[in-house]
């Protein structure tokens, strides 16, 4: 029995309770020579090999039958490269000792990670295939400052936590280890003795791929190459650009009819992408594709922020989908969830036995609505983890924009909480100052690092300046979902037309605050679930009136200031609520031409016309781009307004939201001349009654609404028409 290593140390090492394996294992100089120590469970014989010659230079003595070996190589005073020849079950294997390598993380990286200012933490943390001293393998690192011991376990070591305990970098709380021979495609996790002595097995927070549920292991996977954003894609997100978003849940857009199974990323690239392009959309927005354990969360409770879900294929398959979208001229928006995470044991919850990623007080760290945990944005390493993730999706996958979910739940400490269920901030207020700073910092970094990529906020309150720069007190988002517009318009259109005159302001109110933010007008997935009915089914009246109301609503929406968003199925008027477990009702478009085809054709024409005419999109956020012509005709529920581009070209939009046709409806205009009907939601092409103005109408020198020139139109029942001026 050697007196060089204390028996208690050997016992602790074998039991997996020793926190500093590099102080014992590997090669160490002694007075008698260099000593090599190794923990190799189930080995029966171990030799030290000199790689240059292949010669055995020393045999290690088994000091403990559980696999602890040690031996001195005399006449050697300096550390040298070596390998171990290990006899396992009668077969000899030549291995490189993980404990023969020095520290992995550079001091500057460790400092930046500790400070929370490492722009790309995923380049350092996690699992990265690498070559060290000519040896190929994988370097692993994980932030777990309060753990007593952390090991890498995986397919390369029989999931045995004794075999690969990691080195702790105490200055940063990061554990690291290079494992020779570990390679891409192998499964792994981190096994740790936590701060309280409890054994935990965790997935890698920075894993680039993960197993599909219910399995939870991470996969060694190379860091994707950076994607260069083209100038065309940068311009596509501009405030003056036409932005029409098709919001999609990949798992239920379309499924295989024989087994109701999902389409793969590559199948979606071949089917969804050309469909969205044909429909005239400019952007596809994906509900979260980060790995998540529960299908019913739709991806909004992610456990693998850096890993595309395996439900639809591999990481490379997902990149194929994005590349296909870009090749088709479509930008890709990713729903991003930095607001909360699920409490699954294998994830971030109590990661090292402490509330590392979350707040310890449930009044700050627990989300009552969703049974999830809230990130501690005030902890530098946590904020860095999230900021790096935003940059990762844009730089490494070519994502063009991030839509941030549930911003209100992040920035208000009392969100969905009663009195006594929340903790005020340091000034006694309800704002989550750390979350606000996190969002501002994220948006600032993205603006600096990836100009052209943008962020969009789903923010349900009247927090000022969500899409204004921090210098103006804002959060720094480029766009904000206009949930007020969505609620007001849906409330209006669900009314029987006879009552709409009493709620005229529902449609006019939006212009009173339109210039306070850069708005997106959303008819999203949230509006077709949980008993709210489909958009079509909310419309009043019989089938004819329901479809007419919906068409008129869409005509109003696509002409109103703000970028556009439709959830899948809305474009062909699906009649039932969305179900994430099944395909959209594509059968509604089978057989003969019907009302659903009419709505689909209308949405396509709306998209194409909206994109073609600058007046409909160039000045969404400038008061010059909009003017009411008729705003107060509540008795007849008629609205008329003008959209205008920077050159002064106008489009007139006239809506009649009753089933009563309005012939000879006169209103004043700014520009006399011949006005051509470029869109009529009541056209027979869309299965309407085909009332209208024979394609065009000439203005009169007839004073109306305080203007010397006017138009006299036929306003079809339950319709919106668009007119463009052709000349004097």
Curated annotation (Swiss-Prot):
Involved pathway(s): Glycan biosynthesis; glycogen biosynthesis
SUPFAM superfamilies cross-referenced by the UniProt entry: (Trans)glycosidases (SSF51445), E set domains (SSF81296), Glycosyl hydrolase domain (SSF51011)
EC number(s) per entry: 2.4.1.18
Region described as Disordered: 686-712
Pfam families: Alpha-amylase, Alpha-amylase_C, CBM_48, GlgB_N
Top EC class, one word: transferase
Catalytic residues of the enzyme: 405, 458
SMART domains: Aamy
InterPro entries per UniProt: A-amylase/branching_C (IPR006048), Branching_enzy (IPR037439), GlgB (IPR006407), GlgB_N (IPR054169), GlgB_N_E_set_prok (IPR044143), Glyco_hydro_13_cat_dom (IPR006047), Glyco_hydro_13_N (IPR004193), Glyco_hydro_b (IPR013780)
Keyword ATP-binding listed: no
GO terms classed as biological process: glycogen biosynthetic process
Any one cellular-component term (Gene Ontology): cytosol
UniProt-listed CDD domains: AmyAc_Glg_BE (cd11322), E_set_GBE_prok_N (cd02855)
Catalytic activity from the UniProt record: Transfers a segment of a (1->4)-alpha-D-glucan chain to a primary hydroxy group in a similar glucan chain
Parts forming coiled coils: none
GO molecular-function terms, A-Z: 1,4-alpha-glucan branching enzyme activity; cation binding; hydrolase activity, hydrolyzing O-glycosyl compounds
Keywords: Carbohydrate metabolism, Glycogen biosynthesis, Glycogen metabolism, Glycosyltransferase, Transferase
Subunit structure: Monomer.
Function statement: Catalyzes the formation of the alpha-1,6-glucosidic linkages in glycogen by scission of a 1,4-alpha-linked oligosaccharide from growing alpha-1,4-glucan chains and the subsequent attachment of the oligosaccharide to the alpha-1,6 position.
HAMAP family: GlgB (MF_00685)
Protein name: 1,4-alpha-glucan branching enzyme GlgB
Organism annotation: Enterobacter sp. (strain 638)
Primary gene name: glgB
